[in-house]
Amino acid sequence: MSEMTPREIVDELNRHIIGQDKAKRAVAVALRNRWRRMQLDDELRQEVTPKNILMIGPTGVGKTEIARRLAKLARAPFIKVEATKFTEVGYVGKEIESIIKDLTDVAVKQTREEMMQKVRYRAEEAAEERILDVLLPPAKTSSSGWAQQQEETPENDDQRGTRQVFRKKLREGQLDDKEIEIDLAMPQMGVEIMAPPGMEEMTSQLQNMFQNMGSDKTKARKMRIKDAYKQLVDEEAAKLLNPDDVKEAAIESVEQNGIVFLDEIDKICKRGDTSGPDVSREGVQRDLLPLVEGTTVNTKHGMIKTDHILFIASGAFQMSKPSDLIPELQGRLPIRVELEALTSGDFVRILTEPSASLTTQYHALLNTEGVEVSFTEEGIQRIAEVAFHVNETTENIGARRLHTVLERLMEEISFHATDHSGEKLVIDADYVNEHVGELSQDEDLSRFIL
């Protein structure tokens, strides 16, 4: 679980996302409150429930990007889902409870990786011994059943010395490219079972049964020592783990630190002109209520209580408004954050400030072909103006418009990059006007091309 302070979280988000300070502060405080709650005594900790967040803002302003970056910072079970994928229980489509099941799967994988890191040193030693046993097979047992090398003999000393020499070479990487034949555990069978809605539990049990068949079998494989070492370390680490301990820790992690990011929640708002049951809109909202309020979900790893899972919902709300959500769900999302539409100045910052900005990416990509691309301040300003103008005159898709404009701008040089190896290309305002200026002015063309 992340122990970063709200200020540190916001600073980290600022490296990748421009503006939207209110949203950053809200998620930073929510994430820090997870840590604060864990410092309380058990009795009070159970009473402190998370304050769920609803982020409102037009498309392309950073809602989903905040979720992506938050997932990396949280160091806790995190899942991002699209609200539009779900339907009411009993109808064709994914059930809402599958969110918690998927979150638990994420937690189990995360917990297993963390536990494997703790036993990695022992696993590396065991992997080393197995490789050395292949390179220098131990002495065979005699007819009496005792190893012939039990007694201290000069030959045994020589063998131990040789083993240490090979161990040193192995650790220094001198044997990486040598091929050996070694017994490795066979990979689990990948079985996909299709089942009707509502029978997911039976499906997962059948899949586990088929996957466990033959899981103890080994197969001799010939490969380089470098590749074999990686697989052996993972295999030995898995042997050192107790599956029950992994499940127990994962369930605790989900219940206490789990975060669900529910995107496109505005798409499940009920529209006024519809009549009859709305299984993919209001029905989904009703099914979502118990999860957000707190319920118990049965998963293949065990029972999961959702009382302390944090839900962050987001939506553009262009065709609807937050008040179109059913009142009970509105009450479960007490913190409202409105994200602002991006301006031309924001576009300039997006193109220059993030550590992996679009201009940096294009520079690095074309540099692999020997073409050095540089963007002038006037060129970047003009790209931002074109993107902003097209957003204003057609559909406003926010910062995603920069991808479209830049791809169109760089199309020619990207195609002919191999012919211009060793050359330098300066993207200034004139270059931008020449390649996308006219398109941005023609509304009909920009609607289809930009």
Curated annotation (Swiss-Prot):
SMART domains assigned to the protein according to its UniProt record, in alphabetical order: AAA (SM00382), ClpB_D2-small (SM01086)
SUPFAM superfamilies, A to Z: P-loop containing nucleoside triphosphate hydrolases
Principal localisation: cytoplasm
GO biological process, one term: protein unfolding
Binding site for ATP: 18, 60-65, 263, 328, 400
Top-level taxon of the source organism: Bacteria
Disordered: annotated span: 140-162
CDD domains to which the protein is assigned, alphabetical: RecA-like_HslU (cd19498)
Ranges of compositional bias, category Polar residues: 140-151
Stored InterPro entries: AAA+_ATPase, ATP-dep_Clp_protease_ClpX, ATPase_AAA_core, Clp_ATPase_C, HslU, P-loop_NTPase
NCBIfam families with a match to the protein in the record: hslU (TIGR00390), PRK05201.1 (NF003544)
Oligomer and partners: A double ring-shaped homohexamer of HslV is capped on each side by a ring-shaped HslU homohexamer. The assembly of the HslU/HslV complex is dependent on binding of ATP.
Record family assignment: Belongs to the ClpX chaperone family. HslU subfamily.
Function: ATPase subunit of a proteasome-like degradation complex; this subunit has chaperone activity. The binding of ATP and its subsequent hydrolysis by HslU are essential for unfolding of protein substrates subsequently hydrolyzed by HslV. HslU recognizes the N-terminal part of its protein substrates and unfolds these before they are guided to HslV for hydrolysis.
Protein name: ATP-dependent protease ATPase subunit HslU
Species of origin: Idiomarina loihiensis (strain ATCC BAA-735 / DSM 15497 / L2-TR)
Name of the encoding gene: hslU
